[in-house]
């Protein structure tokens, strides 16, 4: 067996590749490529392997789209391929293609304390289920359970469940968005575009015309306290993040913890800490006490997708994480 395996984290814009030490799980030699510059994922992989002059026979790539069979067609990119054909073309012994939040969930057992910031709750209960979710371009969700010395990731499309308002303000938001877009999923309010939807709905609810703002604009104005509407939108985003996380905790009894990934929350960390997030997480009526001790963590590791891809592959190859 070779010392290293190839790991990757591929989104709509960029493909990030790295080497994983099969024995230790350590990630090294990470490099990001623009997906727009290459005709296929296989082409990017070949360039990476040629640049790093390393022999690799095993690989695991995390991709931001559902993985339901051999044929993979990326949701937000033109790349499409057969896993079996790519494995053959690259001369690999093993090639795993997994959902991006499967990778993030598999990273959790590998994380150290310095990679996490806790938001309330007690200590995690060893062996109990874990949930992970994260807002970015969309809303990713996965669960993780420990079975017979193996970690089993339970991926899905939980970001597309119905948005469930639990206040008068949230109900008005739902009514306005439903009139605009029809079905309103959680992702429609918990993502970069979702933050824009919240802002627009807040302004429209007051019979005013919203500005044409991007997520970055809303966040910057909210943090500068220069726009009341933006601050309300960001505050509501944090509250809905809490409600959604609490729902995940109830679904599977995630006493192993609820983990937040994705690139949005770290951009306004202090605002998030002071927000109504944790109160909303615990706002479960008769089951408030049930979720009270469930810890929530923000993942601040630079590359959980790469770390988790490596963990998934190593476990597939027989290593115990």
UniProtKB/Swiss-Prot annotation:
<keyword id="KW-0808">Transferase</keyword>
<dbReference type="InterPro" id="IPR043129">
    <property type="entry name" value="ATPase_NBD"/>
</dbReference>
<dbReference type="GO" id="GO:0005524">
    <property type="term" value="F:ATP binding"/>
</dbReference>
<keyword id="KW-0547">Nucleotide-binding</keyword>
<dbReference type="InterPro" id="IPR003836">
    <property type="entry name" value="Glucokinase"/>
</dbReference>
<keyword id="KW-0418">Kinase</keyword>
<feature type="binding site">
    <location>
        <begin position="8"/>
        <end position="13"/>
    </location>
    <ligand>
        <name>ATP</name>
    </ligand>
</feature>
<dbReference type="Pfam" id="PF02685">
    <property type="entry name" value="Glucokinase"/>
</dbReference>
<protein>
    <recommendedName>
        <fullName>Glucokinase</fullName>
        <ecNumber>2.7.1.2</ecNumber>
    </recommendedName>
</protein>
<dbReference type="GO" id="GO:0005829">
    <property type="term" value="C:cytosol"/>
</dbReference>
<keyword id="KW-0963">Cytoplasm</keyword>
<comment type="similarity">
    <text>Belongs to the bacterial glucokinase family.</text>
</comment>
<keyword id="KW-0067">ATP-binding</keyword>
<dbReference type="GO" id="GO:0005536">
    <property type="term" value="F:D-glucose binding"/>
</dbReference>
<dbReference type="InterPro" id="IPR050201">
    <property type="entry name" value="Bacterial_glucokinase"/>
</dbReference>
<dbReference type="GO" id="GO:0004340">
    <property type="term" value="F:glucokinase activity"/>
</dbReference>
<keyword id="KW-0324">Glycolysis</keyword>
<dbReference type="GO" id="GO:0006096">
    <property type="term" value="P:glycolytic process"/>
</dbReference>
<comment type="function">
    <text>Not highly important in E.coli as glucose is transported into the cell by the PTS system already as glucose 6-phosphate.</text>
</comment>
């Amino acid at each position: 067996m070779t010392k290293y395996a190839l790991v990757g984290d591929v989104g709509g814009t960029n493909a990030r590749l790295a080497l994983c030490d099969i024995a230790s799980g350590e990630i090294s030699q990470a490099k990001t490529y623009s997906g727009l510059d290459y005709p296929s994922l296989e082409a990017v992989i070949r360039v990476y392997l040629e640049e790093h002059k390393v022999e690799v026979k095993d690989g695991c790539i995390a991709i931001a789209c559902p993985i339901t069979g051999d044929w993979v067609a990326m949701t937000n990119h033109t790349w499409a391929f057969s896993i079996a054909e790519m494995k053959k073309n690259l001369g690999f012994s093993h090639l795993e293609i997994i959902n991006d939040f499967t990778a993030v969930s598999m990273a959790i057992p590998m994380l150290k304390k310095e990679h996490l910031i806790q938001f309330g709750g007690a200590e995690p209960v060893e062996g109990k289920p874990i949930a992970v979710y994260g807002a970015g371009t969309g809303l990713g969700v996965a669960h993780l359970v420990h079975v017979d010395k193996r970690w089993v990731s339970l991926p899905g499309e939980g970001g597309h469940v119905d948005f469930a308002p639990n206040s008068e303000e949230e109900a008005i938001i739902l009514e306005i968005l439903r009139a605009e877009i029809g079905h309103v999923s959680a992702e429609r309010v918990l993502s970069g575009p979702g933050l824009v939807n919240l802002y627009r709905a807040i302004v429209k609810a007051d019979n005013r015309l919203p500005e044409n703002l991007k997520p970055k604009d809303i966040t910057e104005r909210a943090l500068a306290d220069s726009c009341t509407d933006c601050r309300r939108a960001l505050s509501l985003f944090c509250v809905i993040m809490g409600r959604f996380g609490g729902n995940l905790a109830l679904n599977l009894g995630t006493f192993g913890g609820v983990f937040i990934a994705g690139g949005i929350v770290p951009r306004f960390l202090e605002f998030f800490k002071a927000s109504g997030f944790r109160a909303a997480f615990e706002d479960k009526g008769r089951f408030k006490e049930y979720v009270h001790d469930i810890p929530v963590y923000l993942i601040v590791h630079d590359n959980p997708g790469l770390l988790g891809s490596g963990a998934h592959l190593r476990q597939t190859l027989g290593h115990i994480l």
